[in-house]
Amino acid sequence: MNIAEEPSDEVISSGPEDTDICSQQTSASAEAGDQSIKIERKTSTGLQLEQLANTNLLTIRIKWQLQEEEDDHCNSRITDQIMDTIQHYKGISVNNSDTETYEFLPDTRRLQVLEQNKDIYLYEHGSQEYEKSYKDNEEEDDWRYDTVLQAQFKYPKSLENACTDISELLKSEPIGQHIDKWSIGVNKHALTYPGNIFVGGIAKSLSIGELSFLFSKYGPILSMKLIYDKTKGEPNGYGFISYPLGSQASLCIKELNGRTVNGSTLFINYHVERKERERIHWDHVKENNNDDNFRCLFIGNLPYHNPEKVETLITPKEVIEVIKKELSKKFPDFDIISYYFPKRSNTRSSSSVSFNEEGSVESNKSSNNTNGNAQDEDMLKGYGFIKLINHEQALAAIETFNGFMWHGNRLVVNKAVQHKVYNNHNSHDRHPSISNHNDMEVLEFANNPMYDYNNYTYDRYYFNNNKNGNSNDTSNVRYFDSVRSTPVAEKMDLFYPQRESFSEGRGQRVPRFMGNKFDMYQYPSTSYSLPIPMSNQQESNLYVKHIPLSWTDEDLYDFYKSFGEIISVKVITVGGSKNKYRQQSNDSSSDNDLPVGSSRGYGFVSFESPLDAAKAILNTDGYQVSKDQVLSVSFAQKRGNLSSSDDDDQSQTDNSSKFQNFQPHNDYHKAYPTKYNKKFINALMTQNQSQQQVSRENYFIPLQYPNTNTKPVNSYNLISANQNNANWMMPMFPSFGFIPQVPPVPYIIPPQNPAANHIPIMANGSNEEEEFSSGDYSMDY
């Protein structure tokens, strides 16, 4: 196991996927004389932990009066009263074994320890002294606190109320007689489990034993989990490690983050569960979309080149320096918590920007080559986002830099508004934005049920509508989450099942309720039929062509929001996605023919419900939005299925060769290949089941059959029918890869025919077969 002795940069983010949102970093081995770099580390690197902070921590430290042993029950009674107050405000107590040893030190010494280790104990950067019972000049160094109680609160208001009540409790006369000293501390940017870390970049050659030896040097390991590929059985190169204390995890991050082990560079960071990261993210979004609290700013119309230096590109470092230079005059503590300035390459690997110890810019691509395509890829897109310490500084930045002339460009700076994620995952846009947005009349369509969901969707990418920082109006730029989809190679015609899908076969007849309840299964001649996505199409993601070039993401969202809950919307622009596949077959123009930031005339809309997506296609495909523009709407192609239909058929043939040893028992399965999107079919079946909660008695209609051996029966679970029971029959459906579950249907079983055919039915795509007799009879009720 080889470990390269290299200085490591401290990075605080939620994982490798977030490395393009960079904090200002400095090397741990920076020279002591460079005070500016030290100050930068103290503020930016520490404050970046706010992106992961997910709880509010309360710490109560108590030193008891010297008492007889029989009076110890009084101390326990006081402790119980404190814990009752914590529970009253829904606080969660922290296990005593998870309490850091420095919490028992006198306050002055404890603060000295934190100051000396400020570059290590990053999780303590939000700690503040709330109140204490003695003055600083009364403190002595030869004592320790006897009891330390810690609790976590979800809401800052609960923390504040608990602090007030506990402070009054400790000051009360009966309790004060038993306490010598006490102090209360708070941390509104704490981690729930500061001992948990994420480890990325693990070389596949490293064994569990080697990893355990490497990480156990910083403390006992409670647990270690490596993630493996389920199909290949190989490690994915990342995992999770838990230490008992946050100080041990912080020391590990300090020493190993950025080190090269067995040829692979480690990325180590505090770990917060995905659900917690999503909650933190949306808390920040709510704050930023509130005009009274926002701290995140959009900066547009940035110049591409520095005219004072020939062929020199503008870097994020230069933008940050200009902002700091101006605003530090008003705010001595001014700082930028995080920033994001995308490059024209629009790839995560090349858009990641960091600072080395000399302050120069480093990226995954060489910035020395300023010629040809390399220069274009390293060039910024002309816009970015920054997050400041507080709202007051954000307002000052807008006042100072909105309209500020820099290298011949007039900057556009305003509040970065993140759109609500859609229907109503969040109501983010409740307050008017500083930006000006054109309102578009919401179109009303038929068959547009609205659903009310309160779920959140994690939004990891920022986008804006105008990608050109040097032209056009950038005042209406917003950022949205991405629609991670792949364009279809050409327009896909909407597919409606043919009549043969439910034609009457030997010994069967289609149950009448199927045609009545499942609109999508009705014949094309009916007035209302839902389109069905194929297996190589996405069930909830729409590809919309021929949209007006003036439409933005918000306009496209407003157009479709009446159909149901929308997860994300994206209008594709020049200079945006570099996907080599184009949605339009006639889209052969190069980016040089169009201004950067202009719309390509197509986009994506991702719905939460597949049925809402189908209804949107039904209502808007062929819809005339203007005199010369008619929308063309279809299901988006799945990633990796961008070839023509012929190629797709060939790929399916190739895939099917894996199962060449499997031969269907009859021609029925050959006639109905699995080409429908299974998730869509499942959603359709689920909706039908919820609408048809019919009891057994409602369907059971006893009928007289000429033969006395005939028995009326009901089928309640078409999949789990008992093949040994001659009274069970299963209706035949097209092979969707599974047997759809439907409400109970009565059938009349005729006398058994010894010569009846046996038709195998594949249940849920498994290899287990269930055989059912199919005599010459018809089903009715």
UniProtKB/Swiss-Prot annotation:
Superkingdom of the organism of origin: Eukaryota
Listed Polar residues bias regions: 365-374
Keyword terms, alphabetized: Phosphoprotein, Repeat, RNA-binding
Biased composition (Low complexity): 347-364
GO biological process: negative regulation of G1/S transition of mitotic cell cycle
Domain RRM stretches: 195-273, 295-418, 540-638
Family annotation (Pfam families): RRM_1 (PF00076)
SMART domains: RRM (SM00360)
Gene Ontology CC annotations of this record: cytoplasm; cytoplasmic stress granule
Chain positions found as Phosphothreonine: 486
Regions crossing the membrane: none
Modified residues (Phosphoserine): 29, 433, 435, 482, 485, 501
GO molecular function, one term: mRNA binding
Annotated spans, Disordered: 1-34, 345-375, 640-668
Note: Present with 1910 molecules/cell in log phase SD medium.
Subunit structure: Interacts with RBG1.
Protein name in UniProt: Uncharacterized RNA-binding protein YGR250C
Species the sequence originates in: Saccharomyces cerevisiae (strain ATCC 204508 / S288c)
